[in-house]
Amino acid sequence: MMAKNKEPRPPSYTVSVVGLSGTEKDKGNCGVGKSCLCNRFVRSKADEYYPEHTSVLSTIDFGGRVVNNDHFLYWGDITQNGEDGVECKIHVIEQTEFIDDQTFLPHRSTNLQPYIKRAAASKLQSAEKLMYICTDQLGLEQDFEQKQMPEGKLNVDGFLLCIDVSQGCNRKFDDQLKFVNNLFVQLSKSKKPVIIAATKCDECVDHYLREVQAFASNKKNLLVVETSARFNVNIETCFTALVQMLDKTRGKPKIIPYLDAYKTQRQLVVTATDKFEKLVQTVRDYHATWKTVSNKLKNHPDYEEYINLEGTRKARNTFSKHIEQLKQEHIRKRREEYISTLPRAFNTLLPDLEEIEHLNWLEALKLMEKRADFQLCFVVLEKTPWDETDHIDKINDRRIPFDLLSTLEAEKVYQNHVQHLISEKRRIEMKEKFKKTLEKIQFISPGQPWEEVMCFVMEDEAFKYITEADSKEVYGRHQREIVEKAKEEFQEMLFEHSELFYDLDLNATPSSDKMSEIHTVLSEEPRYKALQKLAPDRESLLLKHIGFVYHPTKETCLSGQYCTDIKVENLLATSLLEMDHNRVRLYHDSTNIDKVNLFILGKDGLAQELANEIRTQSTDDEYALDGKIYELDLRPVDAKSPYILSQLWTAAFKPHGCFCVFNSIESLSFIGEFIGKIRTEASQIRKDKYMTNLPFTLILANQRDSISKNLPILRHQGQQLANKLQCPFVDVPTGTYPRKFNESQIKQALRGVLESVKHNLDVVSPVPINKDVSEADLRIVMCAMCGDPFSVDLILSPFLDSHSCSAAQAGQNNSLMLDKIIGEKRRRIQITILSYHSSIGVRKDELVHGYILVYSAKRKASMGMLRAFLSEVQDTIPVQLVAVTDSQADFFENEAIKELMTEGEHIATEITAKFTALYSLSQYHRQTEVFTLFFSDVLEKKNMIENSYLSDNTRESTHQSEDVFLPSPRDCFPYNNYPDSDDDTEAPPPYSPIGDDVQLLPTPSDRSRYRLDLEGNEYPVHSTPNCHDHERNHKVPPPIKPKPVVPKTNVKKLDPNLLKTIEAGIGKNPRKQTSRVPLAHPEDMDSSDNYVEPLDTIFKQKGYSDEIYVVPDDSQNRIIKIRNSFVNNTQGDEENGFSDRTSKGHGERRPSKYKYKSKTLFSKAKSYYRRTHSDASDDEAFTTSKTKRKGRHRGSEEDPLLSPVETWKGGIDNPAITSDQEVDDKKIKKKTHKVKEDKKQKKKTKTFNPPTRRNWESNYFGMPLQDLVTAEKPIPLFVEKCVEFIEDTGLCTEGLYRVSGNKTDQDNIQKQFDQDHNINLASMEVTVNAVAGALKAFFADLPDPLIPYSLHPELLEAAKIPDKTERFHALKEIVKKFHPVNYDVFRYVITHLNRVSQQNKINLMTADNLSICFWPTLMRPDFENREFLSTTKIHQSVVETFIQQCQFFFYNGEIVETANTVAPPPTSNPGQLVESMVPLQLPPPLQPQLIQPQLQTDPLGII
């Protein structure tokens, strides 16, 4: 049963493949293809097919289990399905003959028969014989599949006779055919079927094949199958046909010729290849690997089919080709991208056609490599070419490989770039030409359409050249420009007509009549008509302006972020914060005042005498003062000491104060010069912040022999110098003393020093103190217009550069506080800086003691805004007008500026205000002295202003407060000695923007503060301090007449010659002399009207009386008590609510407005307000002004009187333009007061604190030049580093050496150099200007100037030589007299400056400009010396000559011809100095006294 159920086993056949075998002699170099035929049939997959099989084996391999010492191979079996579906198993045996690799003879085996007989054997036996796979299997059987021959024996069922029909290898086909014939004979004996396989038909030789076919025909029609194992053609057919012969039940196979079978097979391969390639093309990343892709595709049928037919190796090759194609495609795209990017790179690196137009490609490449942006556009690879590096994978790196430029494509792009630049240049030229054509067409108006203009330019060459789009673009740009310009001019016009808008209250709405008036006035303006075609825009601008006028805020300001209020707040926020930090550092430096260091300066042994006197009064250098012991360290220095400046300030000795003692005009002159030098040096180099506050005290030594003759002059000149320098003056006490110095003098001076130190500590206290505004003595409002062409730093620098400047009350971001000595006391002044639009509300609602009105002399709108604002200011409030421009030369060169400056000064003259011009290119505006006289005037009118303000606010009230501000307790200090700001005492600028015509004589405004004594000397008007000072400050002192001066019996008359000089000077002055004491002896004076006539003008309740103390100049020092009785208010009292504090000249009137005092202001108002004001009302308004001003206005003339001492005694406070007409007017209304002679009660003026530059100790800077150089290195290392840095990085910097660098950076450069002389300035990231400033500071720090003082006179004389060649040779000989060290450094510096001047077209620094900036540093001038001031221009021209003729002076070169060579100035006689100093050469706006005499007595023209 079981046997029946078993499935029948498929039939099994054994086929023996035979053919020519044997040694190489028998078969040639290669076999006939038996092994390949078997391999392809048994293992048909391409990866399992091995084309190479060898029959030469070693003995070991022959004895292995695969060969097993037999000459046949067992290839295994394969199960085959027939066409009828019947399976059969075919075992394949290959009969061969193995050759020994040693003897090259057949191996000996168990069967010793020859191959022909062995091959015909039908029974084969070999125990444990393994299946053969390939040659590599031999000896490594364990690494391959191990399959044994079934049962170790097989019976052969048929033979497959292989005949090679190819050309063969060293084998004759006839020999093969003969061998085959013999073999066939043996095979026939076995009675087994035989089929002939014609092998290697892919290399078939046709006649060989025909012979095989003939052979088969002769042998009982043997079947011949044409095969090719390489291409797998008809291999299976051979075995199938043989099986069919064995099993007749199977269908007879169809034998296909080789060519037909090959085509069929190749078609199958091609189809599989196409499918595989499509499969491979799905891979898009050329970074993909075969391993990754094959793992993904191994189960895909198309992949498997191709692998079976062609094999993995071909599949990998196909994949590699595809990947390479992807890579090349990527490289191609990158190359195209680079080529497309090249034009942009060329535009970046080679934009200038003139530079590259004539360069070839290689030269252009070299030029590109030098560009700073080269690395941004190109990358230079270490390995080339670029497409074989990993750069192709850097997708994010868009830089072009530089080696790509070596291709022809890149060169072609470059040529196209050049051509594009040429055409673009032509196109731009034609567009600009067309633009100029449009600009020449006058009738093109804003808003005019292109169509209306096009017909007028049709024939224009440029229009024809450019495209229509370009034409429209150019016209659109032209329209935008003219529209924008028209709108700006329209807006500027609105500001110029500010009087038309600023007549209504804030937050008001203009009426229709007002709008009609505005349009009527503006319609006459061309700038109004210019926007005719843009009427909606014009109306919008007008409404926007009106909205801003009536609702002015920072947010609505038409200047936006450039609003003055915003700029001021930002500047104050940063400046005051930095100032606080500096004060904290200064506070910590000023610690111990138990020990006082005093520097004593004198001449002819005076300093040592004073030091001896102080030591006499001390005990072991300890001095008792006011119950406290102070250790004194005295440092007396005589004027003759050559190292006087270096001794003043050393690391071991830092003085708390300086006593300057004098006993003659000569010694006083020396003191003035010395202090001027110190202050000049301190302001230029700023050695230490502490030195800025160093107090000076002038001490007059007693003269026992000639007290009656010289003492009054010395006292007057000493006091005058002290006032000028803002420092205390210690006079000789009254009485006779045996010694030169009195104990009271020393104590008074020492107290002053201690008070100054104490005040400095209070000023720089790190504890922030926000004092209430009510504590400010004065409140000043500075107004500036938004959009003016100057920085707010220019107008704020006089305050911010002062050490006494501090922040105002919290919340007042636009205010600052200034501590300044005004009159006899230190005052706190609140400065509020506002735009004009913000000031309107302040003007109407808040108490203001004075206005500083700033305007730009370059802008009419600025003057218009000033006029509109000033017109509504009450005429009781002092005003200072400030015109701002670049330089004094603008007045000469620009008529518009000249007109505006003249108008400003004219208005100031009309309203008796002050007028000042500030120049942005000058440094003088950084001194608060610009406003000193104005502050004094404001203080004088303070009470009147406050009462006027109080009256306006409480006009309906019957009760008035006596004082507006509470008195400040500090006004009662018995001793007021405070250091003034840096600016109040800063020396005049080293040079003037125009030249050397500096006014050295005191102006009338300055002289009004002095009166003449009996001997013709001017005395400052001041009084003795007492505890009631605050009452006299805040109450109105009645005008008094001084009692007759009682002559002292011991006063001697002046030298008659001096007296005649003074009288002659006064006689030349046409001013009234009633304001001065007559030039007569005391006994000749009339005393009939010399008593006080008090008028108390402070309004009080009826019946109220008070006592006010006044201090007339009484020689007996008596205090006169005056009772003031108040009666019922007059009509004026009732009308104004108060009684005017001024003298009868002012009358009892209500305050008016400035527009009624100025013809200029009123004429403007009249032209605008003609719709609302009649002519009669205008005349009436002016009538009142006329009656009050009649006879008061007069011109001022220069007083030719010169003080017998130096120029600083003339009261020169401001070289800027200043007009002080009102001070002169006061001389008519007030009687002068004589100075009290009692110096014990004299007020102390503030001390001078020269600013310092360096605030650290240095072993390098400030040292003598000889200590900083060696024979090997004659140039100081610091100078060398600075010059190299400047020449390497900033030679073309605009304004080099003129534009100031950052002060902190300059200090850091020197500090870092102090620590490490090898520093690299480039690594410090500092600006060129900072390095230039540090270089100038180095020379300013030197103990002696680089150009020695001893050679200054010789240089001066040589510069006056008329002949240029002779002058240059004389200067050259003087330079040779320099110390060798100075000569080397001077040559180095001048050579550097010459290089700088050579770049003047870029840096704008000509030799002239450089000499202006450098000559004060190189020559260290004494600006307090009158003779030196008169020669400043000569010294500057000498330095300019050195710079221009550098090659001639130092390198034996030729004289260079220059266009602006400065001719030698005419020689001046020192005796004629007065005439040369009279400022007649300056224009009227710059010297007001030249205009005022030409004005009518009544400037308004009413009479």
Curated annotation (Swiss-Prot):
May interact with RASA1/p120GAP. It comes from Mus musculus (Mouse). GO terms for cellular component: cytosol; endoplasmic reticulum; plasma membrane. Residues 590-763 form the pG1 pseudoGTPase domain. This is Rho GTPase-activating protein 5. Residues 1141-1151 have a biased composition (Basic and acidic residues). GTPase-activating protein for Rho family members. The modification Phosphoserine is found at residues 590, 765, 951, 968, 1115, 1196, 1203, 1219. Residues 779-944 form the pG2 pseudoGTPase domain. Residues 1036-1045 have a biased composition (Pro residues).
